């Protein structure tokens, strides 16, 4: 059975995030500044123990909602709201946790905006908002980013 269009989109985003490595280029000759060690999907109720277990630069993707709108001619437009949570840690006491968080956040943004049509799987994706994860205990830190991903589907191509 072939995967749904939504699943292909989410798998492509997951692949992009997994490719964030210092040895890979975000675009042209701009290399990523971080290495993403672990990517997970639909991980709820994250605990401090989960963060410690998965190590540095752990990224979680959660589907938040979908909104369907009919289009003329029988097509439908679907807007998926995707939550991306990034966790990292300062490995040395002298490391600036804010700088480490910003670096991972930037790399995820570069990976997402590299091709806003995700190899023609969607019409576009757009960053919506970002905020810090509250109640983190040093040396751990995190952020939450939200993206809207819009695609059009017709007939059985759901």
Predicted regions and their residues:
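Extracellular/virion structural assembly segments
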Residues: 75-79, 87-110
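Exposed beta-sheet edge/beta-hairpin loop segments within beta-rich domains
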Residues: 69-75, 134-139
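Oligomerization/assembly interface segments of phage tail-like spikes and tubes
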Residues: 74-91, 140-153
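Glycine-rich, aromatic-bearing surface loops/beta-hairpins
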Residues: 118, 122-157
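Conserved short hydrophobic interaction patches
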Residues: 16, 20, 107, 111-118
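Generic short beta-strand segments
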Residues: 63-67, 87, 130, 148-150
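Residue-level signal for secondary-structure boundary sites
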Residues: 68-69, 90-94, 153-157
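Small/polar-rich, solvent-exposed N-terminal microdomains that initiate assembly or binding
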Residues: 1-74
């Amino acid at each position: 059975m072939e995967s749904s269009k939504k699943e292909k989109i989410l798998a492509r985003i997951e692949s992009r995030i997994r490719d964030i490595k210092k040895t890979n280029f975000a675009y042209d000759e701009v290399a990523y500044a971080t290495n993403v060690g672990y990517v997970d999907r639909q991980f709820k109720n994250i605990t401090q123990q989960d963060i410690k277990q998965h190590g540095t630069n752990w990224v979680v993707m959660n589907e938040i909602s979908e909104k369907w709108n009919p289009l003329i001619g029988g097509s439908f437009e679907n807007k998926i709201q995707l939550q991306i949570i990034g966790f990292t840690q300062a490995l040395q006491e002298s490391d600036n946790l804010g700088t480490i968080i910003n670096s991972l956040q930037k790399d995820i943004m570069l990976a997402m905006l590299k091709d806003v049509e995700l190899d023609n799987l969607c019409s576009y994706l757009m960053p919506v908002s970002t905020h810090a994860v509250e109640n983190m205990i040093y040396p751990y830190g995190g952020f939450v980013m939200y993206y809207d991903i819009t695609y059009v589907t017709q007939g059985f191509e759901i």
